[in-house]
């Protein structure tokens, strides 16, 4: 049997050659990772004439399939893939920069992949950069993290990867700190050690000729006219082209059958317009096929087209009334929630005939809205609960609309001196002011919280978190200056208000490393302390930057300029037990702030996969799940659980089959002790009330908002109403990002041993699980109030709410 080497030459291959290579890469791994076993798997999959690079990929896949035996197999898989990349790429920073800078397109025209100033910087400092860059850190990614980088992030020439992960991180760091090599290297080392990561657009574009590094763009319509609509559409296309996610407020566009003075005609309403936006999102992807364009459309529930809006993403119905590639959100005023709760009427209005509703909030909105009602200016009057149930029905069917509370978002914003905030972004964590002349922008980064756990002492390092939050704050502020803006209105907004968004990933991993169950008092206290530390550190760095460069342009008149911080807007008392807030407020009074907004925990979907952490502040959704890469699907087991089961001698093929049979839950597996069952509860087994409580606890330190998903296995109107009203009453800004549900019946699990599965089902049924009658729309009388329609158990005991019981 022979292989084709990198020169295309035939070469004999032996078991020993493959074994030696795998042994070389198995350093520091668990003894269960047996190179001989891996080698045998590779030999079994080989064929004569296989290329050496394909042989490496086969070896990596073999290890990835074995990762359910022990997580170190995933590390070995990544090492094999990384070693293969290293063989095909240069270890000289300047050489890589030369290739990227001198690249020419198919017609021979210069098409540099990095900017001239970055190229010149690398040549000037090449000796120091080559000394500082640490390629061994490439071997610290797991297989799926490395594959994510390989698929979308590492720069290519003619479809051949040129960058190593360390080159990527160095490029990003230099792109941010082009004028300061020490700060560039500080950022590089912290990112390469996985303490934090900048957001995907920053990783894509930093250091390139057009460094569009911002993640989030928020727009309001230019005008309620053909010119205004298509100018806004063009803005969306230009932003999407450069990898920005978009939130756009459409409540100022007139509704269906509204009079058009210019043509003496009537409007077709929102639906035909949104179908055009839908096709634009499909056509303009984010940077040449890296990921799809994504637009979230925001509307207020008084708009006359609200019912048609709620149907746009549904799978059934007429195609001309659907726009399924957009995401939808409702910007909910408190008045609507009160009317729903009290089972009162709700009037739908056209913004063309009832102007000013989108420009007001709180009492001012209520006065204007009721004035229009009294003057019979509305288009239609419905029961508030009928609209409420239409919202819930759409959420159950499609997972959207997102729910954000307009009054809470405006009342608790440090930008409320600018005007009324009309929408959020694609992921519901950015709350910023927009206008026809300003497109709001936010640059993001996330902190890997699990890196701050001292495993020996079982302690969390708040001092290190404080230090790194300050560095990230400085980085994100620097990006505002370094950024390429796809539209001028974005530059206007970002340079005036200078908001940034710092988030987290791996909070659930942090709890597991510290042995804190997600619902425990210790976890709840740590949750609060983490975000207090981050908010304090970000504010302190913003003050330091303001003392050097001056406060942001629109600072005067903001709550912060009056000594009011985020927790003050929640009427929460925060003492000086951990951080001296009085001293910080004194510094703010003296110097001001460089940034209007600072914290915005985002979903971290891609970057958490790169770093090997659980998403954001979310609990684990399952303890076993699929990861898809181009070469196939792989089972992945929660690595913390796998280690615990392995250390206790409980992990074997039978346990794996039981875990699959129970959809990744361990609650009904009798062999597993109770302490592990508490620690490894999935999100479906955690009380939703506790998740909302923890969101509110950290919310007093989050001056933007947070991407809060809601998880209900079998949603009903009663459960959803209970959950939404609880979040609203707790003062959340984002009440719900996505509604996540579980399928009523599981897909057939071909990999599950049927004998094990039958025993698992018997055990589960024997465990006293109660069957609760489902509540449907038909079982709820429109005569009753939502207060009566909540889960029956919650009426007398909040702790026993069906929505909360997991």
UniProtKB/Swiss-Prot annotation:
The record marks 801, 804 as: Interacts with thioredoxin/glutaredoxin. The active site is at residues 425, 427, 429. It comes from Plasmodium falciparum (isolate Dd2). GO terms for biological process: deoxyribonucleotide biosynthetic process. Keywords: Allosteric enzyme, ATP-binding, Deoxyribonucleotide synthesis, Disulfide bond, Nucleotide-binding, Oxidoreductase. Coiled coil: none annotated. Provides the precursors necessary for DNA synthesis. Catalyzes the biosynthesis of deoxyribonucleotides from the corresponding ribonucleotides. InterPro entries: ATP-cone_dom (IPR005144), NrdE_NrdA_C (IPR013346), RNR_lg_C (IPR000788), RNR_lsu_N (IPR013509), RNR_R1-su_N (IPR008926), Rrm1 (IPR039718). The gene is RNR1. DTTP binds at residues 224-226, 241, 254, 261-262. This is Ribonucleoside-diphosphate reductase large subunit. It is an enzyme of class 1 (oxidoreductase). ATP binds at residues 5-6, 11-17, 52, 56. The lineage of its organism: Eukaryota, Sar, Alveolata, Apicomplexa, Aconoidasida. It catalyses: a 2'-deoxyribonucleoside 5'-diphosphate + [thioredoxin]-disulfide + H2O = a ribonucleoside 5'-diphosphate + [thioredoxin]-dithiol. PANTHER family: RIBONUCLEOSIDE-DIPHOSPHATE REDUCTASE LARGE CHAIN (PTHR11573), RIBONUCLEOSIDE-DIPHOSPHATE REDUCTASE LARGE SUBUNIT (PTHR11573:SF6). SUPFAM superfamilies: PFL-like glycyl radical enzymes, R1 subunit of ribonucleotide reductase, N-terminal domain.
């Amino acid at each position: 049997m022979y292989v084709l080497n990198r020169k295309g030459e035939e070469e004999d291959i032996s078991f020993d050659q493959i074994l030696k290579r795998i042994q070389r890469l198995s350093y520091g791994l668990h003894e269960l990772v047996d190179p001989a076993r891996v080698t045998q798997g590779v030999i079994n999959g080989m064929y004569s004439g296989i290329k050496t690079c394909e042989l490496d990929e086969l070896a990596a896949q073999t290890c990835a399939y074995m990762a359910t035996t022990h997580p170190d197999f995933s590390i070995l898989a990544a090492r094999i893939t990384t070693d293969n990349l290293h063989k095909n790429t240069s270890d000289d920073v300047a050489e890589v920069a030369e290739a990227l800078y001198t690249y020419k397109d198919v017609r021979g025209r210069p098409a540099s992949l990095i900017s001239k100033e970055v190229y010149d910087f690398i040549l000037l400092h090449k000796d120091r950069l080559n000394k500082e860059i640490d390629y061994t850190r490439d071997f610290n990614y797991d297989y799926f993290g490395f594959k994510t980088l390989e698929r979308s992030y590492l720069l290519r020439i003619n479809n051949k990867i040129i960058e190593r992960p360390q080159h990527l991180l160095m490029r990003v760091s230099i792109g941010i700190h082009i004028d300061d090599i020490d700060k560039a290297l500080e950022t590089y080392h912290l990112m390469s050690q996985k303490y934090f990561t900048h957001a995907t657009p920053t990783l894509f574009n930093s250091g390139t000729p057009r460094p569009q590094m911002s993640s989030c763009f928020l727009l309001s319509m230019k005008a309620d006219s053909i010119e205004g609509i298509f100018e806004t559409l063009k803005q969306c296309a230009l932003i999407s082209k450069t990898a920005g996610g978009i939130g756009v407020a459409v409540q100022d566009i007139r509704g269906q059958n509204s009079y058009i003075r210019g043509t003496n005609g009537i409007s077709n309403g929102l639906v035909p317009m949104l179908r055009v936006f839908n096709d634009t999102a499909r056509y303009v992807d984010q940077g040449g096929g890296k990921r799809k364009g994504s637009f979230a459309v925001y509307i207020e529930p008084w708009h006359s087209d609200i019912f048609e809006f709620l149907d746009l993403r549904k799978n059934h119905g007429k195609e001309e009334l659907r726009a399924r590639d957009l995401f939808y959100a409702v910007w909910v005023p408190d008045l609507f929630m009160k009317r729903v709760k009290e089972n009162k009427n709700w009037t739908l209005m056209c913004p063309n005939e009832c102007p000013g509703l989108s420009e007001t909030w709180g009492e001012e909105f209520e006065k204007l809205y009721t004035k229009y009602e009294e003057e019979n200016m509305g288009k239609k009057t419905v029961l508030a609960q009928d609209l409420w149930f239409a919202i819930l029905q759409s959420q159950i069917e499609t997972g959207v609309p997102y729910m954000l509370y307009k009054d809470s978002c405006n009342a608790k914003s440090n930008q409320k001196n600018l005007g009324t905030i009309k929408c959020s972004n694609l992921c519901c964590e950015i709350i910023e002011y927009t206008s026809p002349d300003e497109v709001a922008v936010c640059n993001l980064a996330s902190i890997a919280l699990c890196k701050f756990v001292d495993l020996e002492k079982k302690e969390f390092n708040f001092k290190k978190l404080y230090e790194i939050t300050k560095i990230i704050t400085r980085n994100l502020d620097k990006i505002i200056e370094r950024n390429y803006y796809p539209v001028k209105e974005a530059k206007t907004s970002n340079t005036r208000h200078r908001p940034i968004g710092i988030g987290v990933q791996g909070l659930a991993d942090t709890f597991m490393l510290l042995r804190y169950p997600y619902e425990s008092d210790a976890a709840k206290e740590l949750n609060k302390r983490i975000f207090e530390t981050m908010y304090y550190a970000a504010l302190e760095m913003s003050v330091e930057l303001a003392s050097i460069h001056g406060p942001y342009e629109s600072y005067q008149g903001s709550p912060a300029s009056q000594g009011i911080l985020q927790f003050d807007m929640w009427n929460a008392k925060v003492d000086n037990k951990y951080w001296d807030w009085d001293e910080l407020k004194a510094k703010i009074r003296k110097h001001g702030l460089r940034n209007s907004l600072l914290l915005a925990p985002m979903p971290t979907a891609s970057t958490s996969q790169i770093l090997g952490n659980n998403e954001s502040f979310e609990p684990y959704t399952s303890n076993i799940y699929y990861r898809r890469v181009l070469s196939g699907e792989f089972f992945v087991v929660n690595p913390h659980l796998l280690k615990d089961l392995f250390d206790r001698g409980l992990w074997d093929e039978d346990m794996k089959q039981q875990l699959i049979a129970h959809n990744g839950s361990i609650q009904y597996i009798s062999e597993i002790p109770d302490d592990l069952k508490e620690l490894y509860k999935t999100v479906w087994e955690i009380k939703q009330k506790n998740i909302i409580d923890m969101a509110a606890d950290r919310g007093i330190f989050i001056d933007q908002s947070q991407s809060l998903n809601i998880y209900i296995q079998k949603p009903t109107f009663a459960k959803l109403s209970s959950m939404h009203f609880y979040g609203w009453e707790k003062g959340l800004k984002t009440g719900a990002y996505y509604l996540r549900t579980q399928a009523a019946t599981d897909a057939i699990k071909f990999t599950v041993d049927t004998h094990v599965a039958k025993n698992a089902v018997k055990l589960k049924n024997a465990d006293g699980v109660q069957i609760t009658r489902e509540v449907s729309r038909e079982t709820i009388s429109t005569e009753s109030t939502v207060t009566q329609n909540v889960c029956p158990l919650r009426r007398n005991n909040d702790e026993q709410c069906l929505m909360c019981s997991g």
